[in-house]
């Protein structure tokens, strides 16, 4: 499928929505070595996602899950079940911080991960990726009243930049702006708290994530776009991770993503979860990882 451009404005965050047949788990039994498709056929799938990212992966006060990654994962699992003639399985959610994603997959603690999981060459050495299912770009979150930061270059004045352990955005900034001081936390929500308290000067990660926080704490923060030589600072392709060399599972995920685009579900989920106020999000081309050749 050729890449299709879908434009969405990230704004209102989808309210808490109870998901039928979905439960949360801190650990949970794994279907491990049986493979991703076997887990679906057996009726229980452990899915990793974020618990603290509004509009993408969020555990709500009533313990239901909401967000684009949550909805995409649920669609993929159930679409594969429908295609195979199986019953829809129970989905058990597992929190998957950035630094733990590969380990959770390799240890069989989850069957798949949809957690703002940017595909890159290093990660592809240890896990398989279905997708990509969207393309976003790196940006900055700063305090609303802080006028020191309007461009990427403004960080190169000894300012403190926050990101999450195991994620790549902050190091990419450090590579081009050596004067930046890095501060890492385990979760983006911890970075947001540090930013609000003035302990860091900016948070960097994907624009999709940052607009979710900007909307959740409306009036407290603003998003600053990042460019290099007039182009987006980075391209971030989100994929669905599963065990290395599970090609059958990978192919099934890609086919489900194609169905999600074709029936209009992806555009609907974008609008429901991320609203219509800012930032361009582009559909991915499932199975096309040619961008890794340039990384």
From Swiss-Prot:
Gene3D superfamilies: Periplasmic binding protein-like II
Principal localisation: membrane
Deletion phenotype: Deletion of the gluABCD cluster almost abolishes glutamate uptake activity.
Regulation: Binding of glutamate or asparatate induces a higher thermal stability of the protein structure.
Listed SUPFAM superfamilies: Periplasmic binding protein-like II
PROSITE patterns with a match to the protein in the record: PROKAR_LIPOPROTEIN (PS51257), SBP_BACTERIAL_3 (PS01039)
Protein name as annotated: Glutamate-binding protein GluB
Annotated source species: Corynebacterium glutamicum (strain ATCC 13032 / DSM 20300 / JCM 1318 / BCRC 11384 / CCUG 27702 / LMG 3730 / NBRC 12168 / NCIMB 10025 / NRRL B-2784 / 534)
């Amino acid at each position: 499928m050729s890449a299709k451009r879908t434009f969405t404005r990230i704004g209102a965050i989808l309210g808490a929505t109870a998901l039928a047949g979905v439960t949360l788990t801190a650990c949970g039994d794994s279907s491990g070595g049986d493979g991703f498709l076997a887990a679906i056929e057996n009726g229980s799938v452990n899915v990793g996602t974020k618990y603290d990212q509004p509009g993408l992966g969020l555990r709500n006060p009533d313990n239901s899950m909401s967000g684009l990654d949550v909805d995409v994962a649920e669609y993929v699992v159930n679409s594969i079940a429908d295609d195979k003639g199986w019953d829809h399985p129970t989905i058990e959610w597992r929190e998957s911080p950035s630094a733990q994603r590969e380990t959770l997959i390799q240890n069989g603690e989850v069957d798949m991960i949809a957690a703002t999981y940017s595909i890159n060459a290093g990660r592809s050495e240890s896990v398989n990726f279905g997708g990509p299912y969207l393309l976003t770009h790196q940006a900055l979150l700063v305090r609303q009243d802080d006028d020191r930061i309007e461009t990427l270059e403004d960080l190169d004045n000894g300012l403190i930049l926050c990101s999450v352990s195991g994620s790549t955005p902050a190091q990419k900034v450090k590579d081009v702006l050596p004067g930046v001081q890095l501060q890492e936390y385990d979760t983006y929500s911890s970075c947001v708290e540090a930013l609000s308290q003035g302990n860091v000067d900016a948070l960097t990660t994907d624009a999709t994530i940052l607009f979710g926080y900007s909307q959740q704490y409306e009036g407290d923060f603003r998003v600053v776009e990042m460019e290099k030589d007039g182009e987006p600072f980075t391209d971030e392709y989100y994929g669905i991770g599963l065990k290395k060399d599970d090609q059958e599972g990978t192919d099934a995920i890609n086919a489900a993503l194609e169905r999600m685009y074709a029936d209009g579900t992806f555009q609907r989920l974008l609008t429901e979860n991320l609203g219509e106020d800012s930032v361009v999000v582009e559909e991915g081309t499932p199975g096309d990882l040619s961008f890794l050749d340039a990384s």
